[in-house]
């Protein structure tokens, strides 16, 4: 009996692994084959290149310039591509047949949501790491501060992707999610002129503090928690909408 029980547990574990593998593969395939994702990646890459060329051209011989000095401005431009990618990834689920395909591969909506979160997180980390790494290499000087700034930038870009995707999944409207993401992420630093110190609780303005080279540790921690809270809230809202939706 014990041998049969062990064999049964092995088969069950293998079955679960296969199901998760299929779900992750399906979600990754959707991300890779969605044309809008590639266009968004091109926008982000172009923004990174143009920003670095502009900054390096504006500094005398580029001497002493590190990525920690560039990160806030760099993020303002590059995050546009990540916003577009996140909204596009979520929008494809309810505006095309991809959503039904996902449910056929993984009928359990909770597991599907986790698989989607894992794939988007991995995609954001890889894409942002490539862009940040190239920009770090383009800077004349590299220091510990620059590496820390690069790491925080990778975190922020991944958060932008997840935040935008969460808004898209929760609102189920490309226009609505795009508008919300633009206000919260892209326009937030400009809104600080009208909102004053209250704007720091918006993710876009919190990111500027998170990436600033001269920000205090307390301010950086507060900004990081603000970004985490917004990202988690958007993802939870999207997951709840997916689990409760009829299709």
Q: What residues fall within each predicted segment?
A:
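Secretory targeting signals
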Residues: 3, 10-15, 26, 35-89, ...
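A short amphipathic helical element positioned immediately N-terminal to and/or at the very start
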Residues: 20-32
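Single transmembrane alpha-helix segments in multi-pass membrane proteins
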Residues: 86-98
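Short helix-to-coil transition segments within interhelical loops
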Residues: 103-109
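Internal alpha-helical transmembrane segments of multi-pass membrane proteins
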Residues: 175-179
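C-terminal and late-domain segments of enzyme folds
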Residues: 204-206
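Membrane-interface capping segments at transmembrane-helix boundaries
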Residues: 238-247
């Amino acid at each position: 009996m014990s041998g049969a029980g062990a064999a049964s547990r092995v088969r069950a574990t293998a079955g679960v692994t296969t199901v998760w593998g299929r779900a992750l593969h399906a979600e990754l395939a959707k991300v890779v084959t969605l044309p809008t994702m590639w266009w968004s990646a091109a926008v982000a890459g172009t923004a990174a290149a143009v920003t670095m060329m502009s900054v390096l051209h504006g500094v005398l011989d580029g001497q002493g310039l590190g990525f920690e000095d560039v990160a806030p401005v760099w993020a303002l431009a590059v995050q546009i591509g990540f916003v577009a990618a996140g909204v596009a990834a979520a929008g494809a689920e309810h505006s095309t047949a991809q959503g039904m395909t996902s449910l056929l591969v993984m009928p359990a909506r909770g597991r599907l949501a986790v698989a989607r979160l894992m794939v988007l997180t991995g995609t954001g980390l890889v894409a942002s790491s490539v862009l940040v790494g190239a920009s770090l290499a383009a800077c004349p000087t590299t220091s510990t501060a620059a590496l820390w700034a690069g790491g925080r930038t990778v975190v922020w870009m991944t958060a932008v992707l997840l935040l935008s995707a969460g808004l898209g999944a929760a609102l189920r409207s490309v226009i609505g999610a795009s508008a919300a993401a633009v206000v919260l992420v892209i326009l937030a630093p400009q809104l600080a002129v009208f909102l004053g110190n209250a704007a720091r609780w918006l993710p876009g303005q919190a990111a500027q503090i998170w990436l600033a080279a001269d920000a205090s540790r307390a301010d950086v921690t507060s900004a990081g928690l603000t970004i985490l809270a917004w990202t988690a809230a958007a993802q939870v809202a999207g997951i709840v909408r997916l689990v409760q939706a009829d299709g």
